[in-house]
Amino acid sequence: MKVSQAVALRIKELLKERGMTLYKLEQESGVLHGTMSNIMYGRNKGVTLSVVIQISKGFGMRYQDFLNSPLLDENNLDIE
């Protein structure tokens, strides 16, 4: 799985867990709708650490905790 796909799946997982909408996450994180849309629909080749940090803040968590998921385990990712 590509890193960008894993990030999108992690976002979906956390949105569901927290009963949060994507719109609310955009508002809380400051990530622009276009950027978030590109991540969620696989139109990005990659996701920068700065965007991951913003998204994490939108969830009210540290980016280390966002990345601490089996979805983002390096053994499951296609690193290009």
Model-derived regions: residue spans:
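Short alpha-helical DNA-recognition segment
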Residues: 19-38
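The DNA-recognition helices of helix-turn-helix-type DNA-binding domains
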Residues: 32, 43, 70-74
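A short, Lys/Arg-rich alpha-helix, primarily the initiator
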Residues: 1-21
